[in-house]
């Protein structure tokens, strides 16, 4: 016999077991169930970064550049992945940059290496870029405060990766 929805929900709620919660290190969280929503503590990436190998430039310095009309810039530094530069790019300058490296002050675009040639510190540009080209902006993957996982989520390896990348060391889970 069918019963009204309110009565059915009341019966189900009466049978619910309230589970205890514990806070554990994330290294012990595999195959557990989250007892809280997980929100990001920080932006990812935490800075504007280069989306490819190339040259951090002021886009305006490249306007009009083509295979038939090269523009010329002076190389002032190199930023490898995991490094950063204290230098600020001014008009007429460029910094060689690796994929994933933070965009230096003053730059507003990254010119792909394929559209350049250089000898020593002299850089010839064979193509133009627009502002923001080839830059992954701060928070592109994840913004501070974004919900990453819902409470009651079963924690597998991929969830652990998200939790760790969000900056968590400990989380609340339901006791076994």
Language-model segments: residues:
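Short, low-complexity N-terminal leaders and the immediately following helix N-cap/first helix
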Residues: 1-69
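Short, glycine/charged-enriched hinge/interface segments at domain edges or termini
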Residues: 56-176
């Amino acid at each position: 016999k069918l019963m009204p929805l309110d009565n059915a929900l009341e019966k189900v709620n009466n049978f619910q077991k309230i589970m205890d919660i514990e806070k554990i290190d994330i290294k012990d969280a595999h195959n557990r169930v989250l007892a809280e929503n997980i929100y990001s503590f920080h932006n990812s990436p935490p800075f504007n970064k280069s989306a490819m190998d190339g040259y951090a430039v002021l886009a305006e310095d490249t306007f009009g550049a083509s295979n038939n009309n090269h523009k010329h810039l002076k190389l002032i530094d190199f930023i490898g992945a995991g490094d950063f530069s204290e230098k600020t790019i001014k008009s007429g300058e460029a910094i060689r940059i690796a994929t994933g490296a933070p965009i230096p002050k003053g730059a507003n675009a990254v010119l792909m290496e394929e559209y350049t040639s250089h000898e020593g510190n002299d850089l010839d540009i064979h193509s133009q870029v627009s502002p923001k080209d080839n830059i992954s902006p701060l928070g592109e993957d994840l913004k501070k405060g974004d919900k990453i996982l819902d409470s009651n989520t079963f924690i597998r390896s991929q969830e652990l990766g998200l939790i760790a990348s969000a900056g968590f060391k400990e989380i609340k889970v339901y006791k076994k």
